[in-house]
Amino acid sequence: MAYPMQLGFQDATSPIMEELLHFHDHTLMIVLLISSLVLYIISLMLTTKLTHTSTMDAQEVETIWTILPAIILILIALPSLRILYMMDEINNPSLTVKTMGHQWYWSYEYTDYEDLSFDSYMIPTSELKPGELRLLEVDNRVVLPMEMTIRMLVSSEDVLHSWAVPSLGLKTDAIPGRLNQTTLMSTRPGLYYGQCSEICGSNHSFMPIVLEMVPLKYFEKWSASML
């Protein structure tokens, strides 16, 4: 989860988030090299006497500054497209969970079970126990099995919302009348926090998301106790 004064991303907990972190580092390195080159050219212009100011044609230079940016854009676009296709790919999910956004809470339905659904409200600050996180704790966590492909169906019953869990690399818009889907897979157990990431009204900041990733046998016990 995030902590105060954090500058980087949260620790990756899914293969998709790991890919996003690698892409971020890759793109940042390209931006750093371009920025260094621009600063170097500016420093040369400021510290040396300008020459060839009357040049009307420089075919080689024009060729270079046309081809080089094209190559840089390709180096950025290819890994980006690869990750986009990976995020849209859904193959034989082990579990499907439908989440609906409301003003201002989330409801969840495990569609593989006959009657397993619940609402998830934020716990007010006055009711928090020692060690719990302000504006992030909920009364009903979303319990899911780790190391399994899970499909999330996301929609809304009123206004636009967005279901987002940063450490898993997830952000899916909840649109009334439309069913969006995404996949997630956690590589380790734990609690993973998120929030609504689309301004949806006065209590937009009070729609936390808590995923509890557990081994399969514990998930089976939990699901049996909820039925």
Curated annotation (Swiss-Prot):
Cofactor: Cu cation
Cofactor stoichiometry and binding remark: Binds a dinuclear copper A center per subunit.
SUPFAM superfamilies membership: Cupredoxins, Cytochrome c oxidase subunit II-like, transmembrane region
GO terms for MF: copper ion binding; cytochrome-c oxidase activity
Similarity comment: family membership: Belongs to the cytochrome c oxidase subunit 2 family.
Residue numbers carrying Phosphotyrosine: Y218
EC numbers on record: 7.1.1.9
Catalytic activity reported: 4 Fe(II)-[cytochrome c] + O2 + 8 H(+)(in) = 4 Fe(III)-[cytochrome c] + 2 H2O + 4 H(+)(out)
Sites where the protein binds Cu cation A2: C196, E198, C200, H204
Species name: Bubalus depressicornis (Lowland anoa)
CDD domains listed in its UniProt record: CcO_II_C (cd13912)
Binding, Mg(2+): E198
Protein name, UniProt field: Cytochrome c oxidase subunit 2
Record's function text: Component of the cytochrome c oxidase, the last enzyme in the mitochondrial electron transport chain which drives oxidative phosphorylation. The respiratory chain contains 3 multisubunit complexes succinate dehydrogenase (complex II, CII), ubiquinol-cytochrome c oxidoreductase (cytochrome b-c1 complex, complex III, CIII) and cytochrome c oxidase (complex IV, CIV), that cooperate to transfer electrons derived from NADH and succinate to molecular oxygen, creating an electrochemical gradient over the inner membrane that drives transmembrane transport and the ATP synthase.
